[in-house]
Amino acid sequence: MKSRLLLYLLLLPALLTAQPYAVRQLGIEKGLSNNYVVSIAQDKEGFLWFATEEGLNKFDGTRFITYYKNETKNGYGITGNELNCLLDDPKDSILWIGTQRAGLNAYNYVKDTFTFYRHNEAVPESIITDDVTNVIAAADGNLWVTTYWKGIEYFDKETGHFSHYNTANIPGLVSDNIWTVADGGNGKLYVGHVHNGFSILSIKDKRAKNFVHDPGDRHSLPGNEVRCVYKDLNNNIWVGTNKGLALFNPESENFIQFN
């Protein structure tokens, strides 16, 4: 009883000074193109960007500016309205836009210009497919692009060429259905699969090791649908799955489950 009273007295100042949060809703009635928001990014000028199932939205603090699929000959606009992901380039004034079936778009928000990267069967170094699930900054300043059907792409921003990492050229890679990756900065890529768990890909050797859920092992991956992978400031690898969160230990190759 005394310990509870002491805790209450310690928290009392915070409770007395706490103010209720004000939630401001910004939906289609406020100018948002669609209420299904799939990704958010902030550019270097401070503007917020929202990817939706029906267009790209820029928010300046008071209003939305919407970008839709380009229907004109001048090439201004996005290549598809159904979007999956956004990334503000860590180095350049470019917003990268991953679409569901219309390739990768790059919007230079200083020059107000769009550049498009689409699959071209006649060009081997083009993006391997137009279904982009995520765009991630590579440790060397370039990009990793994940796809739903054809594995992982490494994009060289200087040459505009894509290098392909998939089951056709990576021994041991369990699937080409990829949600996301994280660059470990140590020559390793941490891969989240749509249905087949988690992989560690050696970029130089082009080999992969896979991890899946084992119901009998509490140190295994919690679930096999890996939607997000994150390397924190202490180089820990966090894995978000459909059955909970896990912290991966690269030395023991075990997972600490949080669910």
Report each predicted region and the residues it spans:
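Carboxylate-rich, polar loop motifs that coordinate divalent cations or form catalytic acidic clusters
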Residues: 1-259
